[in-house]
Amino acid sequence: MWSFKKIWFQLHWLIGISAGTVLVLIGLSGAVFSFHEEVLDWLNPGTSSVTLRDAPELSPSALAQAVQASGETRRIDRITVYSEPGKSAQLTFAAEPGQRRGEVVFADPYTGKVLPEQKGKDFFEWVESLHRWLLLPRDDGKPITGTLAFCLLMLSLSGLYLRWPAKPLS
């Protein structure tokens, strides 16, 4: 005769094997993605940082004017200037129609010169897409990863229930 705990154990095992394999993939891709800034900084030393100068850094409005004077016609949506000396500024352009995010470029905060594009950025965009949406279109992958997160929560709770001793220690 099957008891409730035996049936629950079988369900726990089945869901754990099924969802667990995909959850491992999500976890590993998340671990890789968590280091994307450090790896990109290491791969692109001339893009993420600039040589320190005695001159003052440009103000955000002067930086935007310098970038647009270099021939850039797209609308600048956001400028990120770091307080850390020698760190390049980031400019995010407005998203094109049909895109969720605009392109990000780096600029020298002293001159406004646009710096070369980062190498390795496409790889980390792929890793992020794997982690968040399992390389599926966003509207298809988001409910799947949400369901897997719910399965992880249920597996954790059912694992506690299954592991809990039948008789407490006296």
Where do the PLM segments sit?
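Conserved histidines in hydrophobic membrane contexts and catalytic metal-binding motifs
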Residues: M1-S170
